[in-house]
């Protein structure tokens, strides 16, 4: 699947170079310097709306972060058989973080371990048309990323994949 190839590329690039990855459909509400500014954090990402996966449209990391080796290897092993679950890699990422931190579920905030300090934001989606100034997305949702209850990022433009764009 194309999305899974993009996941693999994203993981490889972030492992090698580090940096901040934002999906093209991401709109920052807060300044980027106020979002990724926590001390001693080497991985930022987002708990998806279902609370069972990682929203991979936002990932920030230091170069050579060892969690990405595990994520890359998981993709390479998994693609040897047909993949029926579109969210297989986002769920694996979530479960890997749970395993590292010895948690039953992940929550918004800072998590510290011997080799990995992570900060997690929350994705929250509603079906309320008034929550998004540009309307609901193609799935009928309005989704934002929150940090401790504060909206910091809007995700999923209502018109993505930009209907009406010339081909």
Walk through the language-model features, giving the residues of each.
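Glycosyltransferase-associated regions of secretory-pathway enzymes
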Residues: 1-6, 22-167
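Small-residue hinge/turn detector
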Residues: 7-19
């Amino acid at each position: 699947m194309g999305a899974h190839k993009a996941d693999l590329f994203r993981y490889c690039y972030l492992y090698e170079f580090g940096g901040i990855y934002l999906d093209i459909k991401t709109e920052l509400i807060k300044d980027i310097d106020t979002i990724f500014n926590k001390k001693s954090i080497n991985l930022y990402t987002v708990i998806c709306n279902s609370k069972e996966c990682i929203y991979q449209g936002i990932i920030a990391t230091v170069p050579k972060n060892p969690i990405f080796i595990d994520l890359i290897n998981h993709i390479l092993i998994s693609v040897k058989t047909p993949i029926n679950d579109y969210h297989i890699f986002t769920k694996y990422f979530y479960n890997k973080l749970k395993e590292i931190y010895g948690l039953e579920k992940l929550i918004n905030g800072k998590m510290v371990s011997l080799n990995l300090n992570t900060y997690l934001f929350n994705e929250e989606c509603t079906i309320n048309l008034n929550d998004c100034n540009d309307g609901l997305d193609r799935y009928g949702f309005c989704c934002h990323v929150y940090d401790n209850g504060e909206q910091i990022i809007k995700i999923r433009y209502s018109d993505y994949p930009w209907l009406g764009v010339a081909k």
